[in-house]
């Protein structure tokens, strides 16, 4: 899940300076769970903007906000309302904001800051467990990711700065390498890990921007 945090309303207003009419775009998935762009938040944003003298020509909650085909379909339905707007205020992640721009051709303003790929611990509580590095080593580290959960991104063991099992950089967090050590010991994989070569990450496997085309779709395109 992509974790987002709503920008301060004053910042949103500043980005809309000089624009009278806006169309709102939400997301039914990640932004809904994060309470930054579901139907409830879109309606609240509409009311707040109208209180500030803005005209909201319409709104839509895409399912999801990062699907280009879905965005094009819904934008066609709202063609008139979008045409009346000076810009779109997009209440999803950065990917969704860029999809909205591509699908509409309009100026877009992000209402949220995109933070990380997160897991849901409980309602309203999210944690970053994966950095989408493109070279997963969870099978080697007991299902715990050092690349993400170590602030220094160390892949060859702890830095030596941990104190009482806590991270040197953020003492509120447990040292992930101590967690990995304990987990590998628990599942009987510690000796195997210590005897294996140090993993060297290949940063070339995940360069920006990335693209993935599923083989069946690639074959279909090649046959056209």
Language-model region placement:
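N-terminal glycine-rich "phosphate-gripper" loop used for MgATP/nucleotide binding
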Residues: 90-94
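Short, well-ordered alpha-helical microsegments
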Residues: 96-98
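Iron-sulfur (Fe-S) cluster-binding modules
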Residues: 1-63, 75-88, 102-140, 144-224
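ATP-dependent adenylate-handling ligase core
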Residues: 66-68
């Amino acid at each position: 899940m992509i974790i987002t945090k709503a920008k301060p309303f004053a910042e949103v207003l500043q980005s809309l300076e000089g624009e009278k009419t806006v169309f709102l775009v939400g997301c039914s998935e990640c932004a809904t769970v994060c309470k930054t762009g579901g139907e409830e938040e879109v309606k609240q944003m509409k009311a707040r903007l109208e209180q500030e003298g803005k005209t909201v020509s319409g709104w839509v909650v895409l399912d999801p906000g990062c699907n280009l085909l879905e965005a094009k379909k819904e934008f066609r339905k709202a063609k008139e309302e979008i045409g009346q707007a000076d810009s779109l205020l997009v209440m999803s992640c950065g990917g969704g904001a860029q999809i909205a721009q591509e699908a509409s051709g309009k100026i877009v303003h992000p209402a949220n800051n995109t933070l990380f790929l997160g897991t849901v611990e409980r309602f309203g509580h999210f944690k970053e467990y994966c950095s989408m590095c493109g070279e997963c080593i969870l099978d080697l580290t007991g299902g715990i990711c050092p690349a993400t959960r170590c602030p220094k991104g160390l892949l060859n063991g702890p830095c030596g700065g941990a104190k009482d099992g806590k991270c040197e950089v953020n003492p509120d967090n447990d040292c992930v390498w101590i967690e990995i050590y304990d987990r590998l010991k628990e599942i009987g994989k510690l000796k195997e890990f210590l005897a294996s070569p140090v993993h060297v990450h290949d940063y070339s496997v995940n360069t920006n921007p990335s693209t993935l085309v599923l083989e069946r779709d690639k074959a279909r395109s090649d046959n056209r």
